[in-house]
Amino acid sequence: MYKRQIYAITFFVIFFWAAYEQSGASLTFFADEQTDRNILGWEMPASYFQSFNPIFIVLLVPVFNILWDFLRRHGKEPAATMKQAIGLALLGVGYLVIAFGVDNLDPAVKVSIMWLTTLYFMQTLGELCLEPIGLSIVNRLSPARFSSLLMGVWCLSSAAANKLAGVLSGLYPADGKITSFLGYQIADLSDFFMIFVWMSFAAAIVLALLSKRLEKLM
């Protein structure tokens, strides 16, 4: 029975990491080509955005520890799978923000650094809701003799997510090209980022609806 729960949460995290891992591909292109990185006369290299997530993690981990402890003491702490659904939803919000920021954006215009910063901040919030919880669930449900194998299954989801991330990043509308994904036409950056909005929200909603059932099986 434990395998079903592990496979279920592993399936949903694929969608999270596929959107999250755009930071190393399409989001870096966006930072380089369409983000105004000038700060008081200094142009920040696009690669520096990769340091935002680690910085946010260091700052936010204590906050999340306090938050979960507070909710636990008041009997309001969300179930583990619901935390993961919240993480997916937060990621979707981040992409929704940047999709709004680039809506009808002229290719020659660069947007404020705050749009991408906000996305990375929301990504980090989502990661802190999802990743530690997922590892904890796998570790808790796995029999001792299968713990390494099932942890490998969890890590395999990252491999699948990276493959999907690569496919999706190939849809980035560079040089005005129009692409499509499952019948959805991608003509500009807003269309592109909306892929991750729908993907994250859809996964979050389905996981939230299944949360009670999964928790009972755990």
Q: Which residues are covered by each model-predicted region?
A:
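Membrane-embedded alpha-helical bundles of multi-pass transporters/translocases
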Residues: 6-19, 23-30, 43-212
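Short, small-residue-biased leader/transition segments that mark boundaries at the very start
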Residues: 1-2
